[in-house]
Amino acid sequence: MKTILAVIFFGILAFAFADYPSIPKCTHPPAMANFNQKKFLEGKWYVTKAKHGSNSTVCREYRAKTKGNDQILVGDGYYSFNGGTFYFTVRCKRLPNKEVQKPLQFTCTQKSPDDPSKMFKFQLEVTILDTDYANYAVMYRCVQFPEELGSHFEDNTLLLHRKLDQLVDENLIERKLKLSLPSFKSRDDVVEGCRELPSKKKKTKP
């Protein structure tokens, strides 16, 4: 295990110290057959379990939206940093890729609204192992950190749900993908519960 400067949104950078296995490169498992990128990249997903990470990892939620011709993933939330927990905004723009068996690729920016100096840009790759689009998804994600953080790689496997009160039978997923989900960190492990995101203030016209 290696202590590194990072916690991940989907795999996405956050400024924190956490233990993740050291890997030399991204090693994507096989993607699900006939994966529909458009159906997956719409609406909201909640992380409910993660192979690695902290409370922040399993408390993450993501929104997908279309801005012009661009598909954007939004991962605003609280991230651990220097012993504290702080709010960051995260935006990932998908790169063109029509090959369904290839990883989804994104360019990402994560920054602190209160401290402009805390900002990083990085590349994210995502492979969907299984999903029914309406209820759950199992995702492998991998990030290469920027030069200022060592240019090393970090990966994770996440269980996502559309609704927190409608969880799927994990036994079926385990048998299908040969995963050990009970060994994953769970949102249920967060004793104090996940923090609510701050409400966004609408700009008023003068």
Swiss-Prot record:
GO terms for molecular function: toxin activity. It comes from the Eukaryota. Interacts with host coagulation factor XII (F12) (inactive and activated) (via amino acids 1-77). Interacts with host high molecular weight kininogen (KNG1) (via amino acids 402-532). GO terms for cellular component: extracellular region. GO terms for biological process: suppression of blood coagulation in another organism; symbiont-mediated perturbation of host defenses. This is Triafestin-1. Keywords: Blood coagulation cascade inhibiting toxin, Glycoprotein, Hemostasis impairing toxin, Secreted, Signal, Toxin. Zn(2+) modulates binding to host coagulation factor XII (F12) and high molecular weight kininogen (KNG1). Pfam families: Triabin. Salivary gland (at protein level). InterPro entries: Calycin, Triabi/Procalin.
